[in-house]
Amino acid sequence: MESTECVRVAVNIRPLITPELLNGCTDCITVAPKEPQVHIGSHTFTYDFVYGNGGYPCSEIYNHCVAPLVDALFKGYNATVLAYGQTGSGKTYTMGTNYSGDCTNGGVIPNVMEDIFRRVETTKDSSELLIRVSFIEIFKEEVFDLLDSNSSALLKNDSGVQAKHTALSRAPIQIRETASGGITLAGVTEAEVKTKEEMGSFLARGSLSRATGSTNMNSQSSRSHAIFTITLEQKKIAGGSCTTTEDGGEDILCAKLHLVDLAGSERAKRTGADGMRLKEGIHINKGLLALGNVISALGDEKKRKEGGHVPYRDSKLTRLLQDSLGGNSKTVMIACVSPADTNAEETLNTLKYANRARNIQNKAVINRDPATAQMQRMRSQIEQLQTELLFYRGDSGAFDELQILKHKISLLEASNRELHNELQERRVASEHFSKRAYDAQVEKDKLIMIIESVRNGKSLDEIESCQNEDVGLVNKYVSKIQELEGELLHIKNLKKTSNHQYSDDSYDVGPRSNNVLFPSSNESSDCEDKVMDVTDELEFQEKEIEHCSLQEKLDMELKELDKRLEEKEAEMKRFSSGGTSVLKQHYEKKVYDLEQEKRALQREIEGLRHNLASIPSGPGDGAQKLKEEYVQKLNTLETQVSVLKKKQDAQAQLMRQKQKSDDAAIKLQDEIHRIKSQKVQLQQKIKQESEQFRAWKASREKEVMQLKKEGRRNEYEMHKLMALNQKQKLVLQRKTEEASQVTKRLKELLDNRKASSRETLSGANGPGTQALMQAIEHEIEVTVRVHEVRSEYERQTEERARMAKEVARLREENELLKNAKISVHGDTMSPGARNSRIFALENMLATSSSTLVSMASQLSEAEERERVFGGRGRWNQVRTLGDAKSIMNYLFNLASTARCLARDKEADCREKDVLIRDLKEKIVKFSSYVRYMEIQKADLVHQVKAQTSAMKKLSADENLKNEHSMKKQETRNSTIVLEDMDTSDSEASDHEREDPDLDDEWKPEHESERESEQESVIKLNRKRNFKVGRRRSSVVMRRSYEENSETPSDDAVKSDVCCCTCSKSSSCKTMKCQCRATKGSCGPSCGCSSVKCSNRNADGKENNSISESEALENGENSQESDEKDKGQQQQVLASRGAMLLQNALADKPEEETNDDGGTRRRRKPLSDIGNTTGKSNVPRPSQRKKWKKTVLQLVPVGPPALPPTHTNTHLIPEANSVTVDSDTARMPENSDSGESNSIKLKLPRAMRSASSNGSNLLRERNADQNGSESGGNSGFVQSNSGRASGSRTSDEKENHTRRV
């Protein structure tokens, strides 16, 4: 029976594994709900079953896919389960090839073993089963036996790599092809198994011997294709539903189940394979490529109809799977895929191959024993030939009659089955009734014996005591009788069946002779052989008739013996039914009792006679009466003795009759034994005759089989020659067609050459060549595009893995923060920012996943296009030698141009490498120089600190010397204070901007002494200075007396040794300067300022710039130390203040750094902004006391600042320098020596006033009135009560402005 069906395909989607989840992989496969449909990107595939990821659960794979194959295996069909997919997709886990004896892991193979042996237990009564297993692997295109016990044991090291010497010790197995076209393995081990545990042990042993290894994608990757084969042979036992075939031969089925676990396809770049692993991967991919080509060839319906070539011989794997793919097998393919988007390309290729496999059609047939199958085919052929013969004889109604007979036969077979079932039921009922009849017979015999005992006068106690012995004897006789009856019935049935068989054989002579006398048209060429067959057949029939007559004669004798045996057994049964043995015992006991009673009575009579004789004969009445009593009693006893004698005689007569019956029974038993022995001898003779006839018949059948085999061989040769002839005809026809096509093509080419001869003369590049070149350009562009897409695919994969790690890290930080396991540091991201980052990364991951799937789809389509159009398909348009030369020249030009460009790029790269190397060397040098400068800076800072401490001591000595001169100067200045206080606000503002360094000449060490001298003046001018003080309260002074006393003045030292006596505000342009009058230059010992003085050399300016840079460095160092003590709120406030100041001023005022880290604005000389010079001889009032600190909140408003025309980047103030503290407000009085020339700037009056006042208009608004009017008790008190013209001078105003 042949059935055609397609290969069934199931897709198993495994879940994402831990490494894929860590890399941020997502599912790229979606399963349609309640449909076996899979979506990946823009592709949709439909299969028979889909498991995992929304489909059926994976545990249902066996029930849906493999269980029907096990049913087919027991029906005689070959079956195959094939697991296909990329490495790491779960093929070995699905198949269960890594079986270790534990069934909890599941898998196809363990379930198959359990199901097979469960079915074996249910069918062992009707069939004899023989199960064999084999386990092979295909490693490096060589077939090895995993169950070979002769080869050395395979040892594995810790990493799972097989040792080389053990791998070489195994001998490869050769593949052979049978005469019928099947594939066999020469020398493979086929172990016979009888239990599931035994089969599991072979599977586990082979799994341990299988080649495995570790790669980047799978720690235990299968490095070979494994095939576990289960061979099942079954023969029906007599009494089963299908015991024998119609000709009396046994029906033997032999089927195989192949369980294939393929090695996964892999890419060397992703697996990281090298060396031996790389070679193994090459062989694996080679075998899978051949398998894919076979699937493509079998799945293409057009090629299948045309009878195209299927490349089975390209690989040993495809040769072994030749029957499974397109052959005699029922096949299920399980495509194992990974849902990770990084594996989207391999997953798409696997799904495409699985979709093609659904189009493969297999033709599975029942695999019977060759001899039985041949007899079945011959019988079918005979029936067909008989039907055709009847049809060709002209009897058209015979065919219809045959169909009617076939229908009747089917009905009779159905009726036969029903009757057979009814017979089974009746047989069960008959056994039940026979058992009941047996019990009834035993009970009946028991009752008969009890009745006889009662009739014989036995008491109930005696009957019950003897009942057990009687029951055993009765059961023994009844069972013996039933056995004899069963044997007799069996002999009768055998006799009847033998008679029917002989009669059937005699009836079969006619049809056989008819079949011989009317050979079919197909055998007309072998008439002479058929005549010999007819004579042999007639001789065989005569011999068989003779044997049948002899058998009938022996059967008649056996029937007579059975009849006599029945009669004797019936008579024996009558004897046994009487219970003679029981009666004998009963009567013997009765006789013995009577004899005992007789002797007792005789003794009593003798005693009575003796007593009677001893009685005296006197006349007494007593003696007479006693004598009469004795006489009467004596008579009674004598009467009893006579009765007993009669009974004894009767019993003796019965005993004699019983002895006669016993002798008759013994004689009857002897006759029965003699008849049985004759029967046995006759049966042995019948059996011997049957054996002789069977041996003769077997020899004749063997000769017939040999002749038929030779006839089949001749017929096969004839068919082979006919097929060869037909094939040659087809080849000849194809060659003729090809020749005609080539001739036609040649004519077309000649016509094209004649038509294009003029074009080739005008130029080599014709339209056809241009089209070819464009096609080549297109192919190259496609290749480059594929390379770009693959590179981008790999880059996206790496980038996605990095983002996944970052998301995992951020989530872990969230969890730790929630659990309060870590503390929040300054550099830790806020929770909102972290959540936003996670959300953004997740969106990027989703976008990356869709991009990866799209690129994988493009790469898969490119590979498919390369497979279809690559090779010869790419050059189909090249039809002439000229086109080939043009294409080769064009390709040569492309290759040479690409090579030249590559060389140019290499040269550019080398130049860039040299440049990068030089830059790296410079970076190293500058880094070392920076470290050297930092060391020098630290040394200079240390020196400056030492010099500062020395200058403090020197300034203290100088202050003591100049105390007397300062008192006189203060007295002169106090007389002029009232005059200067009458000036207007604008004049005060101008005086404040006139000379920023006038207050530097004041010595803070003497302020405590000057306070007492100027008390009277301050009291007089308190009212007049109130308005001026309130207006100037915005300029916050936070400089303490103690801090001012620590800052020495370098100009004080210079004034003692000055050449000229010019003031610091003087520019030394007139002849009043002694240095200019003597035609000399001012020097560092002069009293004039280095910034204002125009009579100084460039060297001095350079020295001043050097000193200024040193001061800046010192200020930066101190500023860095101060910044560490300031809080976060001051930094924010300072940054906003800096923004406000930059928006308020067109040009940013230059600032200068003090030694202690404070900053102050550099003031421009009044001569540069158009104001008149203030009076140089104006007395300087005493400084204010320490001002109270106030908080200033600056709001950045106003238009954006204009870019400054010139700004020194190293003088830009820090953001935290706007809020001035008392610690940072100290300014050395010699800071004028480090100032550079200011840039001329014309500003409006209001802006000049704001800038000169330190831009503290907002502070003036928010300042505390009480804080601005008075300071601390230890500081110098400056009155703000009014505008007294004599209380404050322009120098004082300027000093206050500078300190802000």
From Swiss-Prot:
Biased composition (Polar residues): 1169-1180, 1205-1222, 1230-1239, 1275-1288
UniProt region (Disordered), positions on chain: 956-1018, 1097-1132, 1144-1187, 1200-1300
Cellular component terms per the entry's GO annotation: microtubule; plasmodesma
Keyword hit for Cell wall biogenesis/degradation: yes
UniProt xrefs under InterPro entries: Kinesin-like_fam, Kinesin_motor_CS, Kinesin_motor_dom, Kinesin_motor_dom_sf, P-loop_NTPase
Disruption phenotype: No visible phenotype.
Biased composition (Basic and acidic residues): 956-971, 1001-1013, 1289-1300
Keyword tags: ATP-binding, Cell wall biogenesis/degradation, Coiled coil, Microtubule, Motor protein, Nucleotide-binding
Binding-site residues, ATP: G85, Q86, T87, G88, S89, G90, K91, T92
Residue intervals of the Kinesin motor domain: 6-360
Classification via Gene3D superfamilies: Kinesin motor domain
A Pfam family hit: Kinesin
General function of this protein: Kinesin-like motor protein involved in the control of the oriented deposition of cellulose microfibrils.
Binding partners and assembly: Homodimer.
Protein's recorded name: Kinesin-like protein KIN-4C
Organism: Arabidopsis thaliana
